[in-house]
């Protein structure tokens, strides 16, 4: 990337995150006036200065890591879909579209955006709630309007004797703290100490039409643990995913990397139980990571 383009992106990112020139200059060990001249294109940015500025900005990011619920699949031992929708989820059933098909062998479902509640005439199947990534973000907005949190919702799920089929916890790295290609190389060399015995690292190849065909233009993904197990990690360069899906330049992506903890069945239940008991999503997520890696 040319100097002028790099410093333009740097300044835009600094301002978008509300970080002052004074703060960046102090951390980078340069004067505010010097940084001003760099950002206005009056002076060229050397490779050494570029690295110092990038490191300073990374240090000053507000909340460089944030955690969110990114997937929920829960089965309720009841056939009363209205109770689940209106009393537990606190949505209006009349606002949901009813479809005469479902997933996971359910016969029908109620849909509101990406929020899906599935039903079946078979009592043992009960009512199934599925929220994928977009569904979680949409339901988060409803929770905000209801003055509730995920923890309060999960506590209600437990009261309903819900069976947790899958829960994903996602840690967004906004500052590029995780060096995923480096982690992939460490695993390839057998230098990763983990309870897991399975590692899979690869680079996505869907970027050839957007960037030059070389490894540097591809996003790295690392799976720690078997994808067939009830617990595994997926770590990937989210910025490259946004480049492919939305055409957002890597340097402009709000989230650089993502660390996903994917839990199924009993693993999902115990994670939710810990989350509800401690009321600290961060402690639950990093506790799982520290236990297995």
What is the role of each PLM region?
Residues 1-2, 42, 53:
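N-terminal flexible/basic segments that precede or flank functional cores
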Residues 19, 30, 59:
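Short glycine/serine/threonine/alanine-rich loop segments
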Residues 2-5, 12, 16, 58-293:
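Structured, helix-rich domain cores that form ligand/interaction pockets
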Residues 47-62:
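DNA major-groove recognition helix of helix-turn-helix/homeodomain DNA-binding modules
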Residues 8-27:
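Short basic helix-loop element that most often maps to the first helix and adjoining turn
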Residues 29-45:
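Recognition helix of helix-turn-helix/homeodomain-like DNA-binding domains
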Residues 23, 34, 61-63:
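A generic structural-conservation signal
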Residues 5-6, 30, 48:
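Alpha-helix N-cap/N′ positions at the starts of helices
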């Amino acid at each position: 990337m040319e100097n002028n383009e790099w410093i333009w992106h740097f300044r835009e990112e600094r301002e978008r995150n509300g970080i002052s020139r004074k703060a960046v200059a102090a951390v980078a060990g340069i004067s505010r006036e010097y940084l001003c001249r760099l950002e206005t294109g009056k002076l060229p940015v050397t490779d050494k200065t570029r690295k110092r500025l990038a490191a300073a900005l990374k240090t000053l990011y507000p909340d460089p890591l944030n955690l969110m619920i990114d997937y929920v699949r829960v089965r309720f031992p009841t056939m009363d879909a209205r109770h689940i929708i209106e009393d537990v989820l606190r949505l209006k059933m009349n606002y949901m579209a009813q479809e005469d098909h479902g997933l996971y062998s359910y016969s029908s479902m109620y849909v509101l955006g990406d929020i899906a509640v599935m039903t079946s005439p078979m009592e043992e199947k009960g009512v199934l709630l599925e929220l994928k990534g977009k569904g979680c973000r949409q339901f988060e907005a409803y929770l905000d309007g209801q003055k509730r949190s995920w923890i309060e919702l999960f506590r209600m799920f437990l009261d309903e004797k819900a069976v947790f089929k899958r829960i994903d916890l996602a840690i967004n790295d906004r500052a590029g703290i995780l060096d995923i290609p480096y982690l992939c190389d460490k695993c390839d060399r057998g230098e990763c100490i983990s309870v897991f015995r399975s590692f899979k690292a690869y680079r996505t190849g869907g970027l050839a039409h957007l960037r030059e065909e070389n490894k540097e233009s591809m996003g790295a993904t690392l799976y720690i643990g078997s994808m067939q197990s009830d617990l595994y990690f997926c770590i990937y360069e989210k910025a490259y995913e946004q480049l492919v899906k939305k055409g957002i330049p890597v340097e402009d992506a709000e989230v650089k990397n993502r660390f996903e903890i994917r839990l199924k069945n009993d693993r999902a239940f115990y994670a939710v139980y810990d989350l509800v008991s401690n009321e600290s999503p961060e402690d639950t997520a990093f506790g799982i990571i520290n236990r297995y890696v």
